[in-house]
């Protein structure tokens, strides 16, 4: 994990992702009849418990349970997607989820959330978007838009937008750069994620 998160440029993207993940620590308002908003409330409750515990394992579990993990894993490989051996996919995917959980657990104390609001949802071209507003203890306020994919009768979190920037491209850039720095060897990323 340290090898992936070592440069300041890489940390910027992951910090932005962290702000999005940490958005759901203290609920203030929920549109009760909206299933997408109700889903995000469940995510919020579990993130609150995991965040308070400061446990990478609990945060990893929340990402695994509510994230669109298959999509995220595929997208994060970017131009190297076709080079991942089928036998390496399970290790890579679970390693990616653990990476997100560990990094979030490390960074969570830096972004103390005072409260948040889940505002509403809207159907978009690529999924359902749930809008929220995050209030940090220092008075900073962030608007975060969550992108959900519908899976049967439930949803999965696919992305989050902070300051008009979607977060998954930051993870993709991080992973692609790591692979490129290791001679284009996808197995190097798999190895660091499965440690």
Model features per residue range: what roles?
Residues 159-195:
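Low-complexity, intrinsically disordered terminal/linker segments enriched in charged
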Residues 141-169:
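Short beta-strand edge/turn micro-motifs at domain boundaries
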Residues 33-107:
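Early exported N-terminus immediately downstream of N-terminal targeting peptides
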Residues 26-32:
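Sec/Tat signal peptide C-region and signal peptidase I cleavage site
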Residues 49, 53, 57, 82-87, ...:
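Surface-exposed, polar/charged faces of alpha-helical domains
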Residues 14-25:
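Bacterial N-terminal signal peptides
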Residues 1-9:
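N-terminal secretory signal peptides that target proteins for export/translocation
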């Amino acid at each position: 994990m340290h090898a992936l998160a070592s440069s300041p440029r890489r940390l910027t993207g992951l910090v932005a992702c962290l702000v999005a993940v940490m958005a759901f620590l203290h609920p203030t308002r929920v549109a009760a009849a909206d299933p997408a908003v109700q889903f995000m409330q469940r995510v919020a409750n579990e993130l609150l418990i995991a965040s308070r515990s400061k446990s990478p394992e609990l945060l990893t579990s929340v990402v695994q349970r509510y994230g669109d993990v298959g999509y995220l894993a595929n997208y994060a490989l970017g131009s190297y997607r076709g080079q991942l051996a089928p036998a390496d996919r399970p290790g890579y995917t679970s390693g990616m989820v653990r990476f997100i959980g560990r990094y979030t657990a490390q960074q969570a104390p830096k972004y103390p959330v005072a409260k948040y609001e889940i505002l509403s949802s809207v159907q978009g071209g690529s999924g359902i978007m749930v809008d929220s507003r995050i209030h940090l203890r220092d008075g900073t306020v962030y608007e975060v838009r969550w992108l959900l994919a519908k899976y049967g009768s439930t949803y999965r979190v696919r992305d989050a937008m902070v300051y008009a920037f979607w977060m998954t491209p930051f993870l993709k850039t991080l992973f692609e750069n790591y692979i490129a720095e290791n001679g284009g060897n996808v197995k190097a990323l798999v190895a660091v994620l499965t440690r």
